[in-house]
Amino acid sequence: MARPDGRLPDHLRPVTLTRGWSTHPEGSVLVEFGATRVLCTASVTEGVPRWRKGSGLGWVTAEYAMLPRATNTRSDRESVKGRVGGRTHEISRLIGRSLRASIDLKALGENSIVLDCDVLQADGGTRTAAITGAYVALHDAVTWLAARRSLAGRPETVMHRSVAAVSVGVVAGEPRLDLNYAEDASAEVDLNVVCTGAGDFVEVQGTGEAGVFSRGQLDALLDLAVAGCVELAEAQRKALS
């Protein structure tokens, strides 16, 4: 069965990372995975949360949100509802965990960096695009701190590994990389995988949407994901060069 956009099973969608997309933040990136577009901004604050003070460690966290018309039909803003939804909270925490795997918090010193990831247009893979773009925005924010001699460690030691993420799944019995919305909605198995540029795992989230899956299928999906993350790491490297 052909993919909706004609890609081969092991091909990513076209990926674009546009740095400096927003004027005010210390780091900003518009990341595009095909038709999925996420604006990632990094905001630096001197100091850390109260529970972190005196530790000598910095803090990195993230918030995720979607514009009301990022999808086919309009959704109410969560601020209007008066509470953050479970999905939004879960994705925000995933992004934060993933980015903390890329940074030496001791070398960062007692500085805080908040990554805001706002989905402008959704066509599947919003959380994986957010992680991939937010890493580049975080890198730029650390460079900003380094230029002001505000880091506790040597600048080159702060960002000690790259982090990217991609979705994989089984659709019509076939393992596929980087699912768009149509594929994600019909997937029998769906995984989101966060990897370093070296191909080590940071986090794996997966479920059998329409039944169970075998160890062989899982291995095939993880192989696809690692290859995709390595390719995304190269795109990040080029964007930062």
UniProtKB/Swiss-Prot annotation:
Quaternary structure annotation from Swiss-Prot or TrEMBL: Homohexameric ring arranged as a trimer of dimers.
- According to its UniProt record, the EC number is 2.7.7.56
| Biological processes per GO annotation | rRNA catabolic process; rRNA processing; tRNA processing
Task of the protein: Phosphorolytic 3'-5' exoribonuclease that plays an important role in tRNA 3'-end maturation. Removes nucleotide residues following the 3'-CCA terminus of tRNAs; can also add nucleotides to the ends of RNA molecules by using nucleoside diphosphates as substrates, but this may not be physiologically important. Probably plays a role in initiation of 16S rRNA degradation (leading to ribosome degradation) during starvation.
Q: Does the keyword Transferase apply?
A: yes
Chain positions recorded as phosphate binding sites: 87, 125-127
Q: Nucleotidyltransferase: present as a keyword of the record?
A: yes
Q: Which GO terms describe its molecular function?
A: 3'-5'-RNA exonuclease activity; tRNA binding; tRNA nucleotidyltransferase activity
Top-rank EC class of the record's enzyme: transferase
What's the protein here called? Ribonuclease PH
User: What keywords are assigned to this protein?
Assistant: Nucleotidyltransferase, RNA-binding, rRNA processing, Transferase, tRNA processing, tRNA-binding
The highest taxon in the source lineage is Bacteria
| Catalytic activity field | tRNA(n+1) + phosphate = tRNA(n) + a ribonucleoside 5'-diphosphate
